[in-house]
From Swiss-Prot:
Protein name: CTP synthase
Amino-acid positions noted as binding CTP in the UniProt annotation, renumbered to this chain: 18, 153-155, 193-198, 229
Leftover remarks: CTPSs have evolved a hybrid strategy for distinguishing between UTP and CTP. The overlapping regions of the product feedback inhibitory and substrate sites recognize a common feature in both compounds, the triphosphate moiety. To differentiate isosteric substrate and product pyrimidine rings, an additional pocket far from the expected kinase/ligase catalytic site, specifically recognizes the cytosine and ribose portions of the product inhibitor.
PROSITE patterns: GATASE_TYPE_1
Ranges for region Amidoligase domain: 1-272
Disulfide bonds, paired cysteine numbers: none
Designated gene of the protein: pyrG
EC id: 6.3.4.2
Catalytic activity: UTP + L-glutamine + ATP + H2O = CTP + L-glutamate + ADP + phosphate + 2 H(+); L-glutamine + H2O = L-glutamate + NH4(+); UTP + NH4(+) + ATP = CTP + ADP + phosphate + 2 H(+)
Pathway as given in its UniProt record: Pyrimidine metabolism; CTP biosynthesis via de novo pathway; CTP from UDP: step 2/2
Record-linked InterPro entries: Class_I_gatase-like, CTP_synthase, CTP_synthase_N, GATASE, GATase1_CTP_Synthase, P-loop_NTPase
Highest taxon listed in the record's lineage: Bacteria
Length: 564
């Protein structure tokens, strides 16, 4: 395989245990190299057989991150975008399922000329071809590829073999491997143990790959003695053993790696000599705001269906960190399980005690819906800043229909197929869709904002583009009734047909959106809705003068025929 001219490749692998932070390492290295004036992109290769994570349970996979071009991808792509301030795409995430599907499709079309299709060479060649696509189609200096999984997993072997072959094809000056491992601290012995790292490197060597740089995660900083020992047993110079001890925030990782001179070692090994000194002044200022806010703290309640597994809301959590720094406050997040308000008769007032903002999170299915609706109602009636996202917007619409518009049977056809008052309904083009994978309304779409609304005030422009992931929408048959009762439709599709944003004008801050603003919040560009939401929570927390506000009493202006 020919290497795209001048593109250097870095492969990041992980060993010992999963969830060590390969994505954060890749994003941090990318940031350091970009700050030196290099053009960098990052891609993620996942070893599972699913074509994409779109149909996977949030409990198993965490958040599904959606790109501008509508790809449903791994949550690590969110880290790449937040750190590098560069958009990713479908090309940025490859699964083994997509590789096998492509190989099988080619076999069915006769492209292998009757040959026996095997992992070697056909699957490996497919992987190698895909590994170079992003480099071919982009103006890059460096392409970082994160290999998912842990060394020793059988699923990762084809990716590792492709990586081994590429190093032979490209040459050592054009490709290197960074291996992330764990150096556990044993409290009983008061000692860092290097044996797991040694065994992980041994397993990597069995695949024919000698790591060029080791990054060692640990609770405590690595001494020079430990680095020397690890290097001695893993065939590396001690300068190529990088320590990465625990940080208070993931945004401190690039600064720690800068101090460890990881970027300098990478540049030297790749033969890159012309580069500028990194300028991370903004990043340092951001980290200082995150760790040492000057205006106190706020508590935001996230009401969701998957709160037992916070990675399901990874981009939302990080967006709140960004918004907190933007408002000079520390954001404490209280994760609230939506079903608790249904199953245990939970007191919503008690659950939200001390909360300065309520966020009803995205999700699918009817589990926990009535609980979410109760939390929406409490936030609306008690003038607590509120943000609803995707399903959260739909729950806000249902709550408003029931408790303000007098539509007691209002619901979504997602939860009740024969709903008599469907304020949320399946989109017309979705009604004939049978397959689940990759068939939702996905990716970036334009939205027109209404002047004088909170949404327009936050964005400070009339045309925006946001990323979507949904099948259901607000039923336009009810728009007039909602408007008559005080709901403002502050954002719609350019043709005015699809409701994107709803808000209540006489509420402190009540905004709900059909799209996913969390996918576009970055360190360098905090999302305006999250910033506005946290600003309202900050004002609420600091006891600012409350707006003159009374909850809307049910007006019972029923649509003609709605009582039937």
């Amino acid at each position: 395989m020919a290497r795209p001219k001048n593109v250097k490749h870095i492969f990041v692998t992980g060993g010992v245990v999963s969830s060590l932070g390969k994505g954060i390492l890749s994003a941090s290295l990318g940031l350091l190299l970009k700050s030196r004036g290099l053009r960098v992109a990052i891609q993620k290769y996942d070893p599972y057989i699913n074509v994409d994570p779109g149909t996977m349970s949030p409990y198993q996979h965490g958040e599904v991150y959606v790109t501008d071009d509508g790809a449903e991808t791994d949550l690590d792509l969110g880290h790449y975008e937040r750190f590098l301030d560069e958009a990713t795409s479908q090309q940025s995430n490859l699964t083994m399922g997509r590789v096998y599907k492509s190989v099988i499709d080619k076999e069915r079309q006769g492209e292998y000329l009757g040959g026996t299709v095997q992992v070697v060479p056909h699957v490996i060649d497919e992987i190698k071809e895909r590994m170079g696509e992003l480099a071919k189609n982009s103006n890059l200096d460096i392409l970082i590829t994160e290999i998912g999984g842990t060394i020793g997993d059988i699923e990762s072997l084809p990716f590792l073999e492709a990586m081994r072959q590429l190093k032979l094809d490209f040459g050592p000056k054009n490709m290197l491997n960074i291996h992330l491992t764990l150096v556990p601290y044993i409290k009983a012995a008061c000692e860092l143990k290097t044996k797991p790292t040694q065994h992980s490197v041994k397993m990597l060597l069995e695949t024919g790959i000698q790591p060029d740089i080791l990054v060692c995660r640990s609770e405590k900083p690595l001494s020079r003695e430990i680095k020397n020992k690890v290097g001695h047993f893993c065939n590396l110079h001690e300068l190529d053993v990088i320590g990465l001890s625990d940080c208070d925030t993931i945004y401190g990782v690039p600064l720690m790696l800068l101090n460890e001179k990881l970027d300098i070692r990478v540049l030297k090994k790749l033969g890159l000599k012309k580069y500028k000194e990194p300028d991370l002044a903004y990043w340092k200022e951001f980290c200082n705001k995150v760790q040492h806010p000057t205006d106190g703290e706020v508590t935001i309640a996230i009401c969701g269906k998957y709160t037992e597994y916070p990675d399901a809301y990874k981009s939302i959590l990080e967006s709140l960190v960004h918004a907190g720094a933007d408002n000079n406050v520390r954001v404490h997040v209280r994760l609230i399980r939506a079903e608790d308000a249904e199953e245990n008769g939970s007191d919503v007032k008690t659950a939200l005690e001390g909360v300065h903002g309520v966020l009803v999170a995205p999700g699918f299915g009817d589990r926990g819906i009535e609980g979410k609706i109760r939390f929406v109602q409490y936030a609306r009636e008690n003038n607590i800043p509120f943000l609803g996202i995707c399903l959260g917007m739909q729950c806000a619409s249902i709550e408003f229909a029931r408790n303000v518009c007098g539509l007691s049977e209002a619901n979504s056809t997602e939860f009740s197929k024969r709903c008599r008052q469907p304020v949320i309904d399946l989109m017309e083009h979705q009604k004939k869709v049978k397959e689940k994978g990759g068939t939702m309304r996905l990716g970036s779409y334009p939205c027109i904002l209404k002047e004088g609304t909170k949404a327009h005030q936050a964005y400070d422009k009339f045309l925006i583009n946001e990323r979507h992931r949904h099948r259901y929408e607000f039923n336009n048959e009810y728009r007039r009734l909602f408007e008559d009762n005080g709901m403002v439709f502050s954002g719609t599709s350019p043709n005015g047909e699809l409701v994107e944003i709803v808000e209540i004008s006489n509420h402190r801050w009540f905004v709900a959106v059909q799209f996913h603003p969390e996918y576009k919040s970055r360190v360098h560009c905090v999302h305006p809705l999250f910033s506005g939401f946290v600003a309202a929570a900050k004002e609420f927390a600091h006891g600012a003068r409350q707006l003159s506000f009374e909850p809307e009493a049910p007006s019972f202006q029923v649509m003609p025929g709605a009582e039937n």
